[in-house]
């Protein structure tokens, strides 16, 4: 039995007979599936829809990527159903998202992490991302590292950390603008990104103002940043140390260092 469910012009089922399509008319066929990850041996679940008019049979292939993941969603008001927005520097914003809990401050390679809205790291906390981890962002989503918080991306040569959109079809593999940015806010400190791929967003990394620390706001090593609709890296009056990095194919500028700062590449 198939895990796919069909709905043909409002009628659910798996076997449909005598469906009339008038001249110059059409029908809607909706397909959905819910797959138990433990019941499949391959990450690709496949099936076919067969169309038969009695004289000719044709098939349409159905292919679904089945992958377990950790999902991070913003909260929602139980009465109005309005999605929660972040409060930054004590002021409400229109940025949909929430702060990560202490239990969520380590991303591993056991399961991908899928982020809806902005996942924020609160002051005096550190988000650690381990080798081989994959972070998928939904549309207009991203990461925010708040004042006095830190980001540690600890990829390796053979196990890079990947940041990209959550549309994994081949047609989206090089499409810019699928998600927002990794925003290192003013006052975030000692951020380190090593052996990462950051691709297909609006701004790969947005880095804000210099802190009183003698260490760079961001140390960026062995990292590829490409296919962003606006900037690969946008640095505003900040401090960056970069070694062995590739930044390219951005809509406005691959690297923009503005309003002064200290930059060593």
Please name every model-derived segment.
Residues 2-17:
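Short beta-strand and strand-turn-strand segments in soluble, beta-rich domains
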Residues 14-61, 65-265:
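Beta-strand/loop edge motif enriched in small/polar residues
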């Amino acid at each position: 039995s198939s895990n796919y469910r069909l709905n043909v012009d409002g009628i659910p089922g798996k076997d449909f007979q005598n469906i009339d399509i008038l001249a110059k008319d059409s029908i809607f066929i909706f397909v959905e599936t819910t797959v138990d990850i433990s019941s499949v041996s391959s990450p690709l679940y496949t099936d076919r829809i067969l169309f038969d008019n009695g004289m000719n049979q044709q098939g349409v292939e159905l292919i679904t990527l089945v992958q377990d993941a950790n999902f991070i969603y913003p909260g929602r008001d139980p009465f109005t159903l309005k999605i929660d927005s972040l409060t930054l520097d004590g002021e409400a914003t229109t940025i949909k998202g929430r702060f990560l809990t202490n239990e969520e401050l380590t991303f591993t390679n056991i399961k991908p992490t899928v982020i809806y809205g902005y996942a924020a790291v609160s002051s005096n906390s550190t988000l650690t991302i381990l080798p081989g981890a994959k972070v998928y962002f939904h549309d207009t989503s991203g990461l925010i590292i708040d004042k006095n918080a830190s980001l540690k991306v600890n990829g390796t040569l053979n196990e890079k950390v990947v940041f990209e959109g959550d549309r994994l079809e081949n047609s989206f593999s090089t499409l810019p603008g699928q998600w927002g940015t990794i925003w290192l806010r003013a006052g975030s400190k000692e951020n380190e990104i090593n052996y990462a791929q950051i691709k297909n967003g609006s701004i790969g990394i947005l880095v804000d103002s210099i802190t009183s620390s003698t260490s760079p706001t961001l140390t960026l090593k062995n990292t590829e940043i490409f296919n962003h609709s606006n900037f690969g890296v946008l640095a505003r009056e900040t401090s960056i140390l970069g070694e062995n990095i590739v930044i390219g194919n951005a809509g406005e500028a691959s690297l923009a260092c503005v309003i002064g700062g200290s930059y060593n590449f």
